[in-house]
Regions:
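Conserved small-residue-rich beta-alpha loop and adjacent elements
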Residues: 106-172
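C-terminal core of ALDH-fold dehydrogenases
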Residues: 321-427
Length: 427
């Protein structure tokens, strides 16, 4: 990781590099995933089994777990872990329940009735990685808002461990979050099974949750067959800091995201050159104590940078251009600047609100737009799991008042059958 001075060029060269990373695709992976999807579409459970044997070496003896069996895993985990999951679930629930919307209806004096009906999706599938990349927090972040939205059935798919059993921590989180069924299957074949349905695995309306490049590609290819949350790219953190920030905190926060993936980006924008140098020294000191230091170092080498800016306005302008997944404002008066942030997945205010707080515990969702898509996408929310229908009721008298306007608009567009639909009612 190097230190550079913002000059209107160097920072935007970095932006171009990150945009190029976001657009990279591997045709071989796309081809392989397409084959898997078509295989599952045609072959159902047997195809899922064949792909599981091919990629994982074997098929677990028990594949399906109902609600009672899921809840049994609460007795298999560390009580302290269980307690932490329950507390996190409560925080996530408290935040997301404020997002819930109600159906509404309005009746005018004329007798016209209009409104919007809001209800949860029928069935949602959650993909949760297993093995070394097992994330119980992902279960909570995906299942809790779905539950609040009124989703009728929440299905979770997760690959088994090497022993053929599910990860107990993931299953315990599923119990706390209210997951209805779990199927021990992973990879692109699991995503395809959720999208099309098999003899055993039911078809869902939406697929959410993180996964490797094969899972992400499958979700992207199946969008339209089912809805998806988003196509997630590598993790990102951008920190804007002034001279009041703590270099040891900044170094730790940058590394907390860089450890996710060699393609993760970790960028610090600061108005203090001395803070930039101290942060670099802190990285060198702290990285030696971390398990994933090789991943962190590769991420820093390829997609990490410390940029010294003239002022916070310049830093925030660049932040809005980058539209990062995670944005930390480690400045003296962070609330003063929140109104200047237009594009960010989640914003962490001050020196005592580090990004991992949002990943696990605070309440806001950690499923966030990446690769600059925070310009137009939003975090996963209760709204992600509902559908809305509008309804209209007109009386004969009110339609008669509007008929000439409607017919004129339809005829102007050349849609005479539309106009006729109104006309015949008054002949």
């Amino acid at each position: 990781m190097k230190i550079t001075k913002a000059n209107g060029v160097v920072e935007y060269q970095l932006l171009a590099q990150l945009k190029q990373r976001a657009g990279e695709t591997d045709p071989k992976i796309t081809e392989a995933v397409t084959t898997i999807i078509n295989g599952v579409k045609e072959g159902g459970d047997e195809a899922v089994r064949e792909y599981t044997v091919r990629f994982d070496g074997s098929v677990p003896k028990k594949i399906e777990f109902d609600k009672d069996e899921i809840h049994a895993f609460l007795d298999q985990v560390d009580p302290a872990f269980k307690d932490a999951v329950v507390k996190a679930q409560q925080n996530i629930y408290d935040f997301h329940q404020r997002q819930a919307q109600q159906s509404w209806m309005t009746t005018k004096e004329s007798g016209v009735i209009m409104g919007q009906r809001i209800r949860g999706l029928k069935r949602v599938g959650i993909y949760v990685p297993g093995g070394t990349a097992a994330y119980p927090s992902s279960v909570l972040m995906n299942a809790v808002p779905a539950k609040i939205a009124g989703v009728q059935e929440i299905i979770m798919v997760t690959p088994p461990g090497k022993d053929g059993n599910p990860n107990p921590n993931i299953m315990a989180a599923a119990a706390v979050a209210g997951v209805d069924k779990v199927y021990l299957v992973g990879g692109a074949q699991a995503v395809a099974a959720l999208a099309y349905g098999t003899q055993r695995i039911p078809k869902v309306d939406k697929i959410v949750g993180p996964g490797n490049i094969f899972v992400a590609t499958a979700k992207k290819l199946l969008y339209g067959v089912v809805d998806i949350d988003m196509v997630a790219g590598p993790s990102e953190i951008l920190i804007v800091a002034d001279s009041t920030a703590d270099a040891s905190f900044l170094a730790a926060d940058l590394m907390s995201q860089a450890e996710h993936d060699m393609r993760a980006s970790a960028i610090l924008l600061t108005t203090s050159e001395s803070l930039a140098k101290n942060t670099l020294r802190e990285i060198d000191r702290q990285i030696k104590t971390l398990v994933r230091q090789e991943i962190i170092q590769k991420s820093f080498d390829d997609y990490g940078e410390i940029i010294v800016c003239d002022n916070l306005r310049q830093a925030l302008d660049f932040a809005n251009e980058l539209a990062p997944e995670h944005l930390e404002l480690c400045v003296a008066e962070p609330l003063k600047y929140i109104g200047m942030v237009d594009n960010a997945g989640s914003v962490f205010l001050g020196n005592w609100s580090p990004e991992p707080l949002g990943d696990y515990y605070a309440g806001p969702n950690h499923v966030l737009p990446t690769s600059g898509t925070a310009r137009f996408f939003s975090p996963l929310s209760v709204d992600s799991f509902v559908k809305k229908s509008s309804f209209i009721y007109y009386t004969p008298e009110e339609l008669k008042k509007a008929k000439d306007d409607i017919m004129l608009l339809a005829e102007t567009e050349g849609l005479t059958a539309h106009a006729n639909s109104i006309k015949v009612r008054f002949e």
